[in-house]
């Protein structure tokens, strides 16, 4: 006699396919240990499934489950006719797995948010040649206009060879300025705080001396030696205070100047036209003799890649930053769970599960919302 149970229960299994796939579905929403997953299933379905059974089902079926879900997603994407836009975000992140360092390379569409490719490789394989291979292989057969990246030295040559435009992330450009600038600013702030404390202490001593001998005008008689010493001490303290005030003004002026130049550089990237941006940039660079060394060195270095920094001004479809892929990393493999996984397979499975959720929410759902709003 033929039954339909095979659709729901695999041969020689005690639990339905739904129960076996429970951990996969749960893992797309939140992380839970095998013990906690077993407890959730038992509480929800009134069963007595063991931690070991949950583990075995995942090892046996995870890759097949993920492959089926990914195939379904791509089928849906093809049906909705969601195509690659030609604008892509590329980045890498380092992941430590069981004390070994791996590199995750990712390429996502800047407009449709489709994950073009996302892989993990051992750190010793990661080099300029591999980046080129990854991008070339990932973009094969796809429309290619622009690639948005951070400031890695290898990127410009590779992207030029691919025949694409290159946009440097504005956020990362400012980071290269801010790292040395923050040290300088904090150093100046510490000096200013130190001088202000010294000035306050000097003033306290002056006030105390004034309270001891409150002469209104002129010097006290020479016969009053204590009063004369009091006046001399106050005079010395006032001179020291004046010297400190001069230093304070100098450091405050330097700090104010650095912050103003930093804001002017940041403002360059807010303008929409190439002409305005480049004029503002050149005006700053022309002030070589007036600029603090740290600001001039940054501008001089930026001038070598200014075309890549301002590519967005020539095409409004180019994003200014690589923030989307930074968000992608935080969503698909957040820091709070990075140290939990001890095998490459476990990390890859978790990332694939979260990538499926990303595609469902950020690609398919957003496309359907956009279509319904038209």
Question: Predicted segment positions?
Answer:
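RNase H-like nuclease fold core
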Residues: 10-18, 25, 29, 34, ...
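Short, polar/flexible loop-turn hinges at active-site or ligand-entry regions and domain interfaces
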Residues: 141-143, 166, 188-193, 342
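Acidic/histidine-rich catalytic cores and adjacent linkers
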Residues: 149-156, 161, 197-374
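Solenoidal tandem-repeat scaffolds enriched in leucines and small polar residues
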Residues: 183-194, 201
């Amino acid at each position: 006699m033929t039954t339909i149970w095979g659709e729901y229960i695999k041969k020689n299994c005690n639990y339905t396919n739904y129960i076996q796939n429970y951990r996969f579905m749960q893992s797309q929403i939140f992380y839970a240990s095998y013990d906690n997953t077993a407890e959730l299933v038992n509480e929800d379905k009134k069963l007595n499934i063991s931690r070991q059974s949950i583990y075995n089902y995942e090892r046996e079926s995870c890759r097949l489950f993920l492959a089926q879900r990914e195939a379904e997603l791509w089928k849906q994407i093809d049906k909705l006719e969601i195509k690659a836009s030609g604008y892509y975000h590329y980045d890498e992140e380092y992941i430590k797995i069981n004390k070994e360092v791996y590199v995750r390379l990712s390429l996502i569409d800047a407009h449709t948010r489709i994950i073009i490719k996302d892989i993990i490789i051992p750190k010793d394989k990661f080099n300029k040649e591999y980046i080129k291979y990854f991008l070339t292989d990932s973009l094969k057969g796809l429309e290619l206009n622009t690639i948005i990246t951070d400031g890695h030295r290898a990127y410009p040559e590779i992207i030029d060879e691919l025949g694409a435009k290159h946009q440097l992330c504005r956020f990362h450009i400012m980071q290269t300025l801010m790292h040395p600038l923050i040290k300088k600013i904090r150093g100046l702030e510490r000096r200013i705080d130190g001088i202000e404390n010294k000035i306050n202490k000097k003033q306290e001593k002056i006030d105390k001396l004034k309270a001891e001998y409150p002469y209104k005008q002129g010097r006290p008689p020479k016969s009053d030696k204590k009063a004369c010493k009091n006046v001399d001490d106050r005079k010395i303290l006032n001179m020291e205070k004046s010297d400190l005030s001069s230093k304070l003004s100098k450091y405050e002026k330097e700090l104010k100047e650095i912050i103003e130049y930093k804001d002017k550089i940041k403002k360059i990237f807010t303008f929409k036209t190439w002409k305005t941006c480049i004029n503002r940039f050149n005006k700053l660079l022309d002030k070589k003799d007036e600029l603090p060394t740290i600001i001039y060195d940054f501008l001089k270095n930026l001038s070598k890649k200014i075309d890549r920094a301002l590519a967005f001004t020539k095409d409004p479809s180019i994003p200014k930053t690589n923030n989307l892929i930074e968000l992608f990393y935080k969503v698909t493999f957040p820091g709070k769970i990075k140290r939990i996984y001890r095998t490459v397979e476990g990390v890859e499975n978790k990332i694939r599960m979260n990538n499926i959720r990303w595609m469902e929410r950020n690609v398919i759902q957003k496309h359907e919302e956009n279509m319904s709003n038209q």
